[in-house]
Amino acid sequence: MISLIGILIVFLTVFGGYMAAGGKLGIIIKSLPYEFTMIAGAAIGAFVLSNHTSGAKHTLKDIKKVFKGPHWQPGDYHDLLCLLFELIHLGRQNAVAQEEHIEMPESSAIFGRYPRILADYDAVEMICDTLRSASMNYDDPHQVEEVLEKRLEAQMHHAMHSTHALQTVADGLPALGIVAAVLGVIKTMSSIDQPPEILGKMIGGALVGTFLGVFLAYGIVGPFATRLKSVVEEDQNFYALIREVLVANLFNHATNICIEVGRQNAPGHVRPSFGDLESSLKSLKQAAE
């Protein structure tokens, strides 16, 4: 919703200010279809040219995140800590029983209690791979932390592709607007024998291209790229929390301490309160006994 409000403000202030200053929309509306076709068409073509097929599809899919916001909500962080508590607690009591859950998470009763997390491939794989490695005696906390950090960096690099692709388009739009404007000037020069009032309209129409390129770059596409980047970074905190808890587990801290390490490393606006989380953990512990 906030993104839609932002777009509305951009349009109202730009065109409202133009009309309030005495500008007429007629010349813009008349030239818009042709200028927009040239600029948008060239931008789309350059986008397709500079991205592989999967990258282009990934970018188009990610645009909806601009409006939907982060995938992971405060309740998901609470559920993640509860899930990790159950798995770590079970692993310390019965490693064989834990193995059944991490080898087949889709049929696990523990994972099944947290369907939003279970539906996320990256989160489930990160949890299961790390716990599986620990059961195979790859349990040096510093080495595991380094491996997880590299994994998160690779995941972040992939997730940021859409942001970079959109920003590249935004950076190129002003230049494409100039291209459209130059073509308009060339057209105008071929009619140099026309009266000044006609030439004025033709030059004004040509300048619509420059306006449109800059407007789309800094008013629409650029902010889209920035917003998408913030959403990706926000969601990445979810996976970083998994790393913090699982590394704390390898240091052989008490299970509750491992979870508290994760809770305190969660961003403040999504961090579960200590009381609510403690109450949930007590209920889970009682149910397991």
Predicted feature descriptions by range:
Residues 5-8, 12-27, 147, 151-229:
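Helix-termination/interfacial motifs at the ends of transmembrane alpha-helices
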Residues 19-160, 234-289:
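Large intracellular
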